[in-house]
């Protein structure tokens, strides 16, 4: 569960960064 949360958070951060760029 924790791993999934971290993965999801990391994915969201990547998406946010992509949008920011």
Swiss-Prot record:
Reactions listed under catalytic activity: a chlorophyll + H2O = a chlorophyllide + phytol + H(+)
Gene Ontology MF term list: chlorophyllase activity
Enzyme class: hydrolase
EC numbers for this chain: 3.1.1.14
Domain of life: Eukaryota
Pathway terms, separated by semicolons: Porphyrin-containing compound metabolism; chlorophyll degradation
Keywords (A to Z) from UniProt: Chlorophyll catabolism, Hydrolase
GO biological process, one term: chlorophyll catabolic process
pH dependence: Optimum pH is 6.6-8.6 for chlorophyll a hydrolysis, and 6.6-7.6 for chlorophyll b hydrolysis.
Function: Catalyzes the hydrolysis of ester bond in chlorophyll to yield chlorophyllide and phytol.
Family: Belongs to the AB hydrolase superfamily. Lipase family.
Protein name: Chlorophyllase type 2
